A protein has these predicted regions:
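Aromatic- and glycine-rich beta-strand/loop motifs that create alpha-glucan
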Residues: 1-26
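Helix-capping/transition residues at the boundaries of transmembrane alpha-helices
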Residues: 11, 89, 100-102, 174, ...
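Short loop-to-helix capping motifs
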Residues: 15-16, 105-107, 182-184
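Secretory targeting signals
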Residues: 18, 22-82, 111-182, 200-207, ...
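Central hydrophobic cores of alpha-helical transmembrane segments
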Residues: 22-27, 188-198, 215-218
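Transmembrane helix boundary and interhelical loop/hinge segments in multi-pass membrane proteins
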Residues: 81-108, 115
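Helix-loop interface residues and adjacent transmembrane-helix termini in multi-pass membrane transporters
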Residues: 91, 180-181, 272
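Junction motif at the cytosolic side of a transmembrane helix
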Residues: 253-276
């Protein structure tokens, strides 16, 4: 088992794919955190508050995780999602999975090893995302806003951890989906299209229909529920408030559930297919 895990981890980190995705994700995380930080201290044309008067623990959570939030299109999350898809579909496309299955006849060992390797690379991307987000947000807050960074605030520190968990889960969702849809081009296009446009369309549709409970189950909204545990406007802006999100722990459980279902079903189907 240990040898299989090491082999799968080595297989990932000896390619350029993971760090290429990491660079792209870091760039989006940096820019979106800059955008979120730029909202701090803004006022409406009539001089009234736009909602983000100053840095608090909740606004810090928003700023330092902006790239993953549904409100920002979960743009950073698309990279671990696509990486998860590519890691497994590349093996199917180039038949490298065949050699793995022949070398390790017990397919459940292969499935566990691959899943753990995906968790490792997802965690690495999560750390990269946190660093890039802090860098982008801190730059704007320090240079343009003269606001405290609150990097050691307990709520903000908690968001560092949940950001890493969220990145791991999005990578696993892509991995599980890639095992179900083995055509690489189709899998990537469908996953990314849903991650961006699909979630946007669902949010709009559910808002029009007034289906606030259904909207809570959208992955991007679950991610927001995980990362931002209080109203970043401090109640200054009227909104749906908590009605749009589950509690952070329930959001995390449901999102992890999505990844678990896709990964388990994909692994079972992969274990039953003939080696080609």
């Amino acid at each position: 088992m240990l040898g299989a895990i090491k082999s799968e981890i080595r297989k990932i980190f000896t390619t350029k794919l993971w760090w290429g995705m990491g660079i792209g994700m870091a760039a989006f995380a940096f820019l979106l955190s800059m955008a979120a930080a730029s909202l701090i201290g803004l006022t409406n044309p009539d001089g009234s508050s736009a909602g983000f008067d100053s840095m608090t623990g909740a606004t810090g959570q928003m700023v330092y995780s902006a790239g993953l939030l549904g409100e920002f299109g979960s743009m950073s999350a698309l990279f671990p999602l696509a990486l998860g898809v590519l890691l497994i579909t590349t093996e199917y496309r180039h038949k490298t999975a065949t050699a793995t299955y022949l070398a390790t006849p017990r397919r459940w060992i292969v499935a566990v090893a691959k899943t753990l390797a995906v968790i490792v690379v997802g965690a690495v991307l999560g750390v990269v995302h946190v660093i890039a987000s802090v860098g982008g947000g801190a730059l704007v807050l320090t240079v343009f806003k003269d606001q405290p960074l609150l990097l050691g605030n307990s709520d903000v520190v908690a968001t560092y951890g949940t950001s890493i968990v969220a990145t791991v889960v999005w990578t696993l969702i892509g991995f599980g989906f890639g095992m179900l849809v083995r055509n690489q081009i189709a899998a990537v296009l469908i996953a990314v299209a849903f991650g961006f446009l699909g979630q946007l369309i669902l949010n709009i549709a559910f808002a029009i229909l007034g289906w606030t409970t259904a909207a809570k189950f959208i992955p991007g909204n679950l991610t927001t529920g995980m990362l931002v545990t209080a109203d970043p406007t401090g109640g200054a802006v009227e909104s749906g408030g908590d009605s749009y999100y589950f509690s952070w722990w329930l959001s995390a459980l449901i999102l992890i559930g999505y990844a678990a279902v896709l990964t388990v079903i994909g692994s079972i189907l992969a274990g039953r297919k003939d080696i080609t």
